[in-house]
Amino acid sequence: MSAERSPARKPAAGVPAPAELGLLGDDLGYLLRRAQLAVFADFGETLAELQLRPGQFAVLTAIDHNPGVTQSDVCQLLGIQRPNFVAVIDDLEARGLARRTSSAADRRSNSLLLTAAGKRLLQRAVDLQREHESRLARRLGPGGRQTLLELLSRIANTE
């Protein structure tokens, strides 16, 4: 989007002119946030049938790939504030999807594991996540998903 404008049409009498974004239309942070909101809304709707939120999906995935991981390590891995994480893991534990055990290495911290029910739910969620990713890939066009992943990884410093 450039700063130049094409000639604007005058709105019909009594109809307000459409609002414009101005410099926000070229602002990376603004557009990343809008894209994140759109993607999370779709993913949230996708996971709703499992009564699972995107953040819970991320936590279950992290635990599944790192059995016995500590709460602190999951917080660091996913960028979750510890007070927020406690509520997430409390909910997952109450639903019988994850469990905490005292860490063998440091009894002051908890190790996290998925239960059998948690593994089953996560597999269903992964299937839905793949459908969600396919929808996004179609919107981005051939090669668009991979290009976007590479660019976002540069920004997020996760390469």
Identify the role of each PLM range.
Residues 1-50, 154:
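N-terminal leader segment of winged-helix/HTH proteins
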Residues 71:
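Helix-turn-helix DNA-binding elements, focusing on the entry/boundary residues of the two helices
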Residues 75:
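The alpha-helix within a helix-turn-helix
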Residues 81-84:
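Helix-turn-helix DNA-binding motif, specifically the short coil turn and the N-cap/start of the second
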Residues 6, 10-11, 40, 68, ...:
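Charged, amphipathic alpha-helical coiled-coil/dimerization segments
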Residues 62-66, 151, 158:
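Short amphipathic alpha-helical elements of helix-turn-helix/winged-helix folds
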Residues 27, 31, 38, 42, ...:
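Pre-recognition alpha-helix immediately N-terminal to the DNA-recognition helix
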